[in-house]
Amino acid sequence: MEAITFTARKHPFPNEVSVDFGLQLVGSLPVHSLTTMPMLPWVVAEVRRLSGQCSKKEPRTKQVRLWVSPSGLRCEPDLEKSQPWDPLICSSIFECKPQRVHKLIHNSHDPSYFACLIKEDAAHRQSLCYVFKADDQTKVPEIISSIRQAGKIARQEELRCPSEFDDTFAKKFEVLFCGRVTVAHKKAPPALIDECIEKFNHVSCGRRTDWEAPTGQPSAPGPRPMRKSFSQPGLRSLAFRKEFQDASLRSSTFSSFDNDIENHLIGGHNVVQPTDMEENRTMLFTIGQSEVYLISPDTKKIALEKNFKEISFCSQGIRHVDHFGFICRECSGGGSGGFHFVCYVFQCTNEALVDEIMMTLKQAFTVAAVQQTAKAPAQLCEGCPLQGLHKLCERIEGMNSSKTKLELQKHLTTLTNQEQATIFEEVQKLRPRNEQRENELIISFLRCLYEEKQKEHSHTGEPKQTLQVAAENIGSDLPPSASRFRLDSLKNRAKRSLTESLESILSRGNKARGLQDHSASVDLDSSTSSTLSNTSKELSMGDKEAFPVSETSFKLLGSSDDLSSDSEGHIAEESALLSPQQAFRRRANTLSHFPVECPAPPEPAQSSPGVSQRKLMRYHSVSTETPHERNVDHLPGGESQGCPGQPSAPPPPRLNPSASSPNFFKYLKHNSSGEQSGNAVPKSVSYRNALRKKLHSSSSVPNFLKFLAPVDENNTCDFKNTNRDFESKANHLGDTDGTPVKTRRHSWRQQIFLRVATPQKACDSPSRYEDYSELGELPPRSPLEPVCEDGPFGPVQEEKRKTSRELRELWKKAILQQILLLRMEKENQKLQASENDLLNKRLKLDYEEITPCLKEVTTVWEKMLSTPGRSKIKFDMEKVHSAVGQGVPRHHRGEIWKFLAEQFHLKHPFPSKQQPKDVPYKELLKKLTSQQHAILIDLGRTFPTHPYFSAQLGAGQLSLYNILKAYSLLDQEVGYCQGLSFVAGILLLHMSEEEAFKMLKFLMFDMGLRKQYRPDMIILQIQMYQLSRLLHDYHRDLYNHLEEHEIGPSLYAAPWFLTVFASQFPLGFVARVFDMIFLQGSEVIFKVALSLLGSHKPLILQHENLETIVDFIKNTLPNLGLVQMEKTISQVFEMDIAKQLQAYEVEYHVLQEELIESSPLSDNQRMEKLEKTNSSLRKQNLDLLEQLQVANARIQSLEATVEKLLTSESKLKQAALTLEVERSALLQMVEELRRQSARPSTPEPDCTQLEPTGD
């Protein structure tokens, strides 16, 4: 037996910068993970005390080596240099990640000691405290700094590089997307899925009827044309109006569920909208560790991505058991910040797959919840036992021994008599030498006591019944100390409840004040941060009272509930379901704009002495009124101009009907002295900031503008109203479109400001009003109003109105520019697409070429490929054979394979009887396959190192999935077999997805590869026998060597046949094998296998056991050199073993029959074998009949060709005779002409009268 040898790694972090320190390990102690920094000095003292109590035989401290690096923290014994490293003896003391070190302490009394607290078990909340001593106390800060820096780097790496397990261990299922449903609540009855499916079918049938109806007839009122959802491509929406009543729905029967859902469906314009049947609705439903993905194999993109926290409900159909759906939260459109609940409905191939999906979802939710709970940081509440110990350690920190002892005695009185007696007895047993040692012992026993209590403690607010039961069981027989302790706890609870009550009262007062301030006045110059902080407190108090946390248990019928249990998610969900008015009232102090759907503006609140209103003074603002105009504003009788309360809708400003009330005049009077009007419109904070920046940024603003009269900041009429205040009173309520243009005067101060501060802009430039867009859609200011000037400066030039011709030219120019931009964008998209295609092709063909193709050979291939109508032209096969032997250019290989397939079809015009149905590729992709699990598993195994297929569910894997899925649907007998993914992958690397599918059909049906993938695998057994016979005939010594060690071809050659060498050999070699398969057929695989084994025969014969021989053939033999590969390819071109393969196949069947006849069997066994033989013979007869039919068809076609050739030959002979007669007649005429030319005296004969003699 050979000895087991291994090499131990001395340095644990060789690839990173690691630091090691020589230290003395004083000891360790398990403590609770809630141990705080004030407790740690007492823990260190306990560890040192326990270390001092060790026996004399054992050393008090242990020499260790501490290795620190960002990837780990490792402590191992420090051996002497003479002692050898033995991994069986010298195991590490502890090893952990540096981010698990959550506390470090340096002892100030003894600087050579330090301790670290390491999280060991997050589930049981256990930590370990290790205490070290350094020989040089000056190095302790360096050690602590190194550990902290390593933890910091490790945490940054975790954030930078997220976990890769989500995609690796994700479960994938193929589903058919049925439709999308908008529901009113995050819960739904189990019958929701069935009702949605029925509605989908009903609407689809109605739409189909509408499409089939003639266009001339008026269409009946029915569902509107289907529209896509804005959130996801190809997803449709259905709305539910009312909320589902969870309690009643769960207690009712299924029939009541049906009626309830029927009542919740919206009629009218919002109708059921299922998906488009013409689109490819198949999706890959991927369940990760914390998310659910919906990937479209057609578009190669993620169609939907939802976190587990967003999914609130999962359910399977009751009547439609092959359907399921889940409800999730989605953001509402329009940027309003709200959300709604959407149910997605899917279909699977069968019920078993739906059950598996539901079980996987439930397990994923459970695991994610456990992980989230484990990751949640442990916190102390006011009632925690360790919190009392923490406060005690804080109080005694820095005290001398005597004062510490007094504090400890006071604290011990709060314990029960039994606990006090136990601690006193334990301390007296150990006989402390001094007060300090006695204090350490008391703290140690208190820590143990409180840690035991902490295990049974439930934090404040957690629904745990143990504390309630314990509180109820407290009797009157408790000692006085315990009663005092109980009294203190009750007082603490009373304080907390009183504080919470006061805070809730104050929050309600803040809400009322916020509503009153909204309707009366808003302090726009107050601090935004203070407002936000106050409002956040108000929301945190008010919302928690208003919305109780709903239960989060799993539902019946395999349904799963919401994973997130935090109150914030429920608060956000419930607040979104409120009316806009309620939401608006709650956030009146913080929102910088009104909600979009506010039904009515809030009425102005009456001024009360209890509510103080701040003054709003803008001393740096510019007044747009003269003193005379301000006096006019305050005339009695309701003539004063005021700005209305602005609702969310944008009507033009109008006078408030209550403007004539006495209170309204009071507000106007206050407004003249700087206070806001009761109807003032609160403006956006961003608008005010922008306006202040605009004014403050101008360095030329004169100082005297500070002393101008303050202007109401809420008066939007000053900004966008085109008329003066005293002039707008008469026509403000009328139609402003028909009024003539009024003049508006600027004061001479305003003219100075407009000319000095912004001289480059006209006074009525639209840019002055860009920052007012958040006020609402008020009537725009007209650029045609002339401005009269009453100051010392001249009139300001107004912009002239453009003529219709100029406007037409501007429109024409804008349209032409837009057309040009669109064309340029299209060209850019085309260029980007072509660039992506080139990059994709380069990525696919990223392999080393075996036989470099010369330029002359490439020219020959390009000439043949560019021949017009090449699919109908037969090329010389000797020329094609020679070209393939000389090499195939890599960038033309896919096109050459299609060319060879076309030549095969021309050579064999009558295909075999087993041709598949001609179903379009796109139609196959729209169906679900039952082979999805096997295909999805093999996707990650197919060329895992190639960049095109390496990405999990990337473009390469999705295209490969589409091809394999389509073939499994096309060929139901074969379906999917392991090995097909490599064949399809090789094809996909050299051509497009649909072309690769066509070539896969050609290889399977025309080239005969389909037989070896049948479920019975009989053809594969025959192929193994044929390979053994070839070895026996061509390489007898190698065959004997393999038989001697009982190595059959199935141990090493099965993947060669099933994957066509693609799973083990380099891609360049496999591509050359495919070149020859397209040219010669499936017998090329035998030739390549025989050539490989024969060329490596000397090396195989050197190995003398089964393991080494098989390992050499599987691992060493595929790593061929370029020379050996070229030699193998050239040998394959010279081989011809077709007759041998046919003879070996017949031999296999004969031997099989002989073995069946010779073996003594019972009657039943003989009957079964005869039946199997009969069925196999029938199959062979059918195959022979097919071959006979093909041969007869070929014979008939050849006979017809011969007949055609004979008839054409007779016609050609007759034509030849006719031409011969005509030729002889012409020759006679030429002779006659020569004779006549020899006799010049005689008259020339008339050539027109000459006729050919004879026939």
From Swiss-Prot:
List UniProt keywords, sorted A-Z.
GTPase activation, Nucleus, Phosphoprotein
Q: Residues bearing Phosphothreonine?
A: 499, 590, 1218
Summarize what the UniProt record says about post-translational modification. Insulin-stimulated phosphorylation by AKT family kinases stimulates SLC2A4/GLUT4 translocation.
Family matches, as InterPro entries: DUF3350 (IPR021785), PH-like_dom_sf (IPR011993), PTB/PI_dom (IPR006020), Rab-GAP-TBC_dom (IPR000195), Rab-GAP_TBC_sf (IPR035969), Rab_GAP_TBC_domain (IPR050302)
State its location(s): Nucleus
Q: Does the keyword Ribonucleoprotein apply?
A: no
Tell me the Pfam families matching this sequence.
DUF3350, PID, RabGAP-TBC
What molecular function does GO assign, one term? Answer: GTPase activator activity
Sites of Phosphoserine modification: 146, 229, 231, 489, 497, 501, 519, 521, 559-560, 564-565, 579, 608, 621, 660-661, 697-700, 782, 1028
Region of interest: Disordered? 208-228, 509-544, 559-581, 595-614, 621-681, 764-786, 1233-1255
Domain PID stretches: 238-398
Which GO terms are recorded in the biological process aspect for this UniProt protein?
negative regulation of insulin secretion involved in cellular response to glucose stimulus
PROSITE patterns, alphabetized: PID, TBC_RABGAP
Comp. bias regions, Low complexity: 519-539
- List all Polar residues biased stretches: 670-679
**Tissue and organ distribution:** Expressed in highest levels in hematopoietic cells, testis and kidney.
Ranges for domain Rab-GAP TBC come to: 887-1081
Subunit structure of this entry?
Interacts with APPL2 (via BAR domain); interaction is dependent of TBC1D1 phosphorylation at Ser-229; interaction diminishes the phosphorylation of TBC1D1 at Thr-590, resulting in inhibition of SLC2A4/GLUT4 translocation and glucose uptake.
Functionally, this protein is described as follows: May act as a GTPase-activating protein for Rab family protein(s). May play a role in the cell cycle and differentiation of various tissues. Involved in the trafficking and translocation of GLUT4-containing vesicles and insulin-stimulated glucose uptake into cells.
The identity of this protein, by name, is TBC1 domain family member 1
What is the species of this protein? Mus musculus
